[in-house]
Amino acid sequence: MAKSRSVYLHPQQRERIHQFSRSWLWRSELPTWLLIVAVYGWWRELGIFPATLLLIWFTAWYMSLQHELIHGHPTSRPWFNQLLGTLPLAVWYPYGLYRDSHLAHHHHHLLTQPVDDPESYYFTPQSWQRSLIHLRNTFIGRLLVAPLLDIAQTLGSALAAFRHRRVNTIAMWLVHGLLLAALFAWMNHLGFSPLYFVLAISYPALALTKVRSFLEHRAADDPLARSVINEAGLVWRVLFLNLNYHSVHHDLPGVPWYGLRKIYLHNQAEYQRRNAGFVVRGYGEWLRHFFARPVAVNAHPGFNQQGKADEEHE
C-alpha cells in the first residue's frame, strides 16, 4: 500500500513543520510511547466490574492508538508498530484489515466514494436501503446501530475471504482468532467474563469511536472540502488523539497526533478557507442538530442510478 502524500498550505508551513519535527518531543515520540504504556498497563489492571466505564475509555483509546501506529508512529518500522497494535483489544477486526482499509481511505480524490473508499458512509443508489440508513444517520443511531452494521460487514468480508481462498487474508484472520482466544482465556482465568467484555465494553467502545466519525466527511466536488475540522473540547481531543482536526490529518497524515492541533492553530483561517468552511464547534453541535434527525449521508451524489461514478466527482 502506497504511503499517503503530505499536502502543505505553502512553503512556509512546510519549513515550520520541518522545524517542529526536529524538536526533541517529535523525535522521541514520547507522547505516543506514554499512550502505549497507559493503554496496555492500565487496561490490564482495570479488569474488574466497577471499572467498566474506564475499560470502555481505554479500549476506545486503543483504537485511536492503532490509527497512530498505522501512520508510522511511534517508530518508522511498520512491522514493529504492527506488533504494538495486533493485540485484539478491539475484538472486531484484525489490525492488518484496519491498516489496509484505512490507507486506502487516504486517497484524496476517492474520498467518500462508496465503491473506492472503504470508510465511506455513503452508498451507491442500488445499495441504499432508506429506513435502515436513515436510522444509522441520526446521532443516536450512529452509536447504537452503526457498530453492528460495521461488524456485520467485517465478518461478511472475512467469510468471503475464506470462500474465495484468499490465503493472506485467511492467515490474518486465523492469527486474530488465536490471539482473541488467548485474550479471552486470560480474562476467564482472572474471573472476568469475556462475554461481558464483548457486550458491555468492546461494543460501547466501538460505538464511542463513531462519535468522531459522525459527518467526518462529506461528498463535496473539491477533495479539499471533504474532511471536517471539529473544534472539539479537551476530553474528546485526548480520546481521539486530535483526529477531530481531520482536514489537517488528511493533508498531513505523517504528522504525529500531538502536532495536529498546533499546526491547525498556526493556520486556522487558512484551513477553514481550504476546506470551504466545513467546521463544527464540537461534537455537541452534531448531538443537538442530529440526535434524532438524520444527516444527509445516503446515496452518494457522484453516482448515477447505474452505480457508476459521474465524471465531475472522479
Question: Residue spans of the language-model regions?
Answer:
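Extended hydrophobic/aromatic segments used for targeting, binding, or gating
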Residues: 201-233, 237-240
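Histidine-centered catalytic micro-motifs
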Residues: 63-72, 98-111, 212-221, 239-255
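Short, charged/polar micro-motifs that form catalytic or ligand-binding hotspots
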Residues: 88, 92, 201, 250
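Short, motif-level signal for alpha-helix interfacial/capping segments enriched in acidic residues
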Residues: 38-50, 84, 194-197, 219-234
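Juxtamembrane helix-capping/reentrant segments at transmembrane boundaries
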Residues: 74-93, 115-130, 223-236
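Residue-level signature of the transmembrane alpha-helical core
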Residues: 52-53, 57, 83, 87, ...
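Non-catalytic, topology-defining segments of multipass membrane proteins
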Residues: 1-61, 65-66, 88-195, 258-314
